[in-house]
Swiss-Prot record:
Gene: env
Residue numbers spanned by region Disordered: 737-761
Positions of region (V2): 170-213
Glycan-linked positions: 37, 70, 114, 148, 158, 173, 186, 200, 204, 214, 246, 249, 280, 286, 297, 308, 318, 373, 379, 462, 478, 627, 636, 652
Protein name: Envelope glycoprotein gp160
Organism ancestry: Viruses, Riboviria, Pararnavirae, Artverviricota, Revtraviricetes
Region (V3): 313-345
Length: 881
């Protein structure tokens, strides 16, 4: 039994030691390299110096470097806030440049369009001539027709198959500046922008309406602007960063990209607005690669820049644009016909056939593709039906909107058999006809805009074709179609799809064995800070947690210094542009990012302050770690991996830290209040005596109120037995008070019970003993309170006495056990001491004997060696004798 008690005691002691030294507590680290996905607005920087471009973006200083990270991150070009912001912002740029702003509801009227006036310019005869000239027999394909820089038809604008623009002259009456007087106006429309009613052939006029007139969002351009594309880059606000997947195998979606770099800004990109093709992109390389949507067949194909693919468009003619004042503050621009207008057209240069062949080969090698491997069965096709922007290749040239019919180009690139096509499409050419529209469908939002007629003079645009927008479809592995697409937004998924925006989260939580302590008496190793800039501390993102914690102080300083530096740079450029930023959409975004970094830093410090860790790099907390089975591998885990593991615990840990800090503040407050009692002089302070007087008054008032309540209860109990005045004295407490009546006053008539005397003395009851009665009642009350308190204390003592006795007995037993154990230890120690002494004596004796024997042996050996010469001499002497 005693042995069992000893074992139990040892187990309890070991568990206590384990509970003290092995409990892990929450530790807060500030300056760790971790992040999470973010969706805040980015700001734009550009080197373009034209007015509207600099109004929209901040000046670009070109100092943006990338830093490689040893981490794995997921990337998606379609679920990406960077690409979504680019699409929205480029649309804002587009509208700012082209400016459709005046609603055209006054022009939704009936117009009289003169057919003979239109025919006089040959605007309709050419089309009918071409239509009727088609033979009805088996069609014959025309000879391949190509143009280049030296072709004469380029300069003369008379290449084969090009026509005149189909236009119609119309008149309409409207009320002008005078409300009661109408005025007739002339206007020339593109035939595709009008809807006319068919009338008899003898009538030269037709009733026509502007197309899409019932659409409420139709707007006319206030002013004619060029849509010159600009190159710009996106930059993250301070406290945020841009990660980029640097893997050459990245195809728009990669859940585990291991080649990640970080920067504060993206690469330069181009503001492209076109269907089918992407122009002047910045992602072209000496290879062809594909961005493929993760869930459907949408793709954006980057073309190999080795083939030098170009597209050059031209709008010939000498048009004149005149303003027509409809009413005050509303001007509509008309284009009278001064010369025979010619059709716009575009021609394609470079090794297009080789480029498309490489595109097909790249599709076959793509892991998402499961169609035929025969590139001859992969065809480049035009979409069928839909809006004009889908059916035609739509682009913008110097502010004009070109719609190009691409059949000739597709026939040329694919070497198609044109014998089965319609007569007008039966050509294989490297140029295509285009026409200009005033009413276009908006590419970003549902709606239509009306723009000014084309500007005067020749218009020429030269572009480099860098990408191809297409949907790839295949059926049964026999045929694959590369269908050209009108998704303008895909261009920006190619430009910025390898980026993702993240928010730096420098606060990390991890379990350690250290509890909260004060650092007032401790010393710190001073460490020199090597400022890498704001993103420098992310270089340790791929390092283990233990290695990062060593440098967390330097990293937190680097983080703050980088935020302040980046904030100052942004503030400087905003100051330089403040006059131009007042009326722009992006100006508001830029000003918004100006305060983001400081807000983020203050938010982090407020959170640290709520935990009692303000301005500390490593802060130990008294809160135990809530999940003992979840601990970091300090030598292998990175902070980013550890943050993902404990993400589900973060909310719970945060609540525990706040509760612990609140309790800590309460304890400090109570401790400070107790500090005022440690000085004896404070007990006699005037403020203290005022409090004592208040406490005394409270006691007196309480006793009085209690007595009143008791008296009322007693009176109510007496009333149940019979009536007696509440304030009358108890029985037998009466004293007669004699009063002398004035003889001059009339004598009061006798009453019943007066005794028949009308004399001068009378008596009435007075409660003179009532005060004595109250005193006795108060004494009785105090006696009752004293007896009850004494009874309560005696009962408490009686209840606690067995517990105290058992506790005392337990303590005695523990003391006996400890004394027994101590006796055992003392006996064992004495036995051990005696054994050591005996061993020492035995060893000493043994060593002494061994040393004597050894010394004797050495002495004899020495004597024998010393005797050798003497023996030799003696031998020689004997020999000589």
């Amino acid at each position: 039994m005693g042995c069992l008690k000893n074992q139990l005691l040892i187990a309890i002691l070991l568990l206590s030691v384990y509970g003290i030294y092995c409990t892990q507590y929450v530790t807060v680290f500030y300056g760790v390299p971790a992040w999470r996905n973010a969706t805040i607005p980015l700001f734009c920087a550009t080197k373009n110096r034209d007015t509207w471009g600099t109004t929209q973006c901040l000046p670009d200083n070109g100092d943006y470097s990338e830093l490689a990270l040893n981490v794995t991150e997921s990337f998606d070009a379609w679920e990406n806030t960077v690409t979504e912001q680019a699409i929205e912002d480029v649309w804002q740029l587009f509208e700012t440049s082209i400016k459709p702003c005046v609603k055209l509801s006054p022009l939704c009227i009936t117009m009289r369009c003169n057919k003979s006036e239109t025919d006089r310019w040959g605007l309709t005869k050419s089309s009918t001539t071409i239509t009727t000239a088609a033979p009805t027999s088996a069609p014959v394909s025309e000879k391949l027709d190509m143009v280049n820089e030296t072709s004469s038809c380029i300069a003369q604008n008379n290449c084969t198959g090009l026509e005149q623009e189909q236009m119609i002259s119309c008149k309409f009456n409207m009320t002008g500046l005078k409300r009661d007087k109408t005025k007739e106006y002339n206007e020339t429309w593109y035939s595709t922008d009008l809807v006319c009613e068919q009338r008899n052939s003898t009538d030269n006029e037709s009733r026509c309406y502007m197309n899409h007139c019932n659409t409420s969002v139709i707007q006319e351009s206030c002013d004619k602007h060029y849509w010159d594309t600009i190159r710009f880059r996106y930059c993250a606000p301070p406290g945020y960063a841009l990660l980029r997947c640097n893997d050459t195998n990245y195809s728009g979606f990669m859940p585990k990209c291991s080649k990640v770099v970080v920067s504060s800004c993206t690469r330069m990109m181009e503001t492209q607005t076109s269907t089918w093709f992407g122009f002047n992109g910045t992602r072209a390389e000496n290879r062809t690669y594909i961005y493929w949507h993760g869930r459907d067949n949408r793709t954006i194909i980057s073309l190999n820049k080795y083939y030098n693919l170009t597209m050059k468009c031209r709008r010939p003619g000498n048009k004149t644009v005149l303003p027509v004042t409809i009413m005050s503050e509303l001007v509509f621009h008309s284009q009278p016909i001064n010369d025979r207008p010619k059709q716009a057209w575009c021609w394609f240069g470079g090794k297009w056939k080789d480029a498309i062949k490489e595109v097909k080969q790249t599709i076959v090698k793509h892991p998402r593709y499961t169609g035929t491997n025969n590139t001859d069965k992969i065809n480049l096709t035009a979409p069928g039906g839909g809006d004009p922007e889908v059916t035609f290749m739509w682009t913008n040239c110097r502010g004009e909107f070109l719609y190009c019919k691409m059949n000739w180009f597709l026939n040329w690139v694919e070497d198609k058999d044109v014998t089965t096509q319609r007569p007008k499409e039966r050509h294989r050419k490297n140029y295509v006809p285009c026409h200009i529209r005033q009413i276009i469908n908006t590419w970003h939002k549902v709606g239509k805009n009306v723009y000014l007629p084309p500007r005067e003079g020749d218009l020429t645009c030269n572009s480099t074709v860098t990408s191809l927008i297409a949907n790839i479809d295949w059926t049964d592995g026999n045929q694959t179609s590369i269908t050209m697409s009108a998704e303008v937004a895909e261009l920006y998924r190619l430009e910025l799809g390898d980026y993702k925006l993240v928010e730096i989260t420098p606060i990390g939580l991890a379990p350690t064995d250290v509890k909260r302590y004060t650092t007032g008496g401790t010393s710190r190793n001073k460490r020199g800070v090597f400022v890498l800039g704001f993103l420098g501390f992310l270089a340790t993102a791929g390092s283990a947690i233990g290695a990062v914690v060593v440098d967390v102080t330097a990293q937190s300083r680097t983080l703050l210094a980088g935020i302040v530096q980046q904030q100052q740079q942004l503030l400087d450029v905003v100051k330089r542009q403040q006059e131009l930023l007042r009326l722009t959409v992006w100006g508001t975004k830029n000003l918004q990012t100006k305060v983001t970094a400081i807000e983020k830093y203050l938010k982090d410090q407020a959170q640290l302050n709520a935990w009692g860790c303000a301005f500390r790099q490593v802060c130990h907390i008294t809160v135990p770690w809530p999940n003992a089975s979840l601990t970091p591998d300090w030598n292998n885990d990175t902070w980013q991996e550890w943050e993902r593991k404990v993400d589900f615990l973060e909310e719970n840990i945060t609540a525990l830290l706040e509760e612990a800090q609140i309790q800590q503040e309460k304890n400090m407050y109570k401790l400070q209040k107790l500090n005022s009692w440690d000085v004896f002089g404070n007990w006699f302070d005037l403020a203290s005596w005022i409090k004592y007087i208040q406490y005394g008054i409270y006691v007196v008032v309480g006793v009085i109120l209690l007595r009143i309540v008791i008296y009322i209860v007693q009176m109510l109990a007496k009333l149940r037995q019979g009536y007696r005045p509440v304030f009358s004295s108890p029985p037998s407490y009466f004293q007669x008070t004699h009063t002398q009546q004035d003889p001059a006053l009339p004598t009061r008539e006798g009453k019943e019970g007066d005794g028949g005397e009308g004399g001068g003395n009378s008596s009435w009851p007075w409660q003179i003993e009532y005060i004595h009665f109250l005193i006795r009642q108060l004494i009785r009350l105090l006696t009752w309170l004293f007896s009850n308190c004494r009874t309560l204390l005696s009962r408490a003592y009686q209840i606690l006495q067995p517990i105290l006795q058992r506790l005392s007995a337990t303590l005695r037993r523990i003391r006996e056990v400890l004394r027994t154990e101590l006796t055992y230890l003392q006996y064992g120690w004495s036995y051990f001491h005696e054994a050591v002494q005996a061993g020492w004596r035995s060893a000493t004796e043994t060593l002494a004997g061994a040393w004597g024997d050894l010394w004797e042996t050495l002495r004899r050996g020495g004597r024998w060696i010393l005797a050798i010469p003497r023996r030799i001499r003696q031998g020689l002497e004997l020999t000589l004798l």
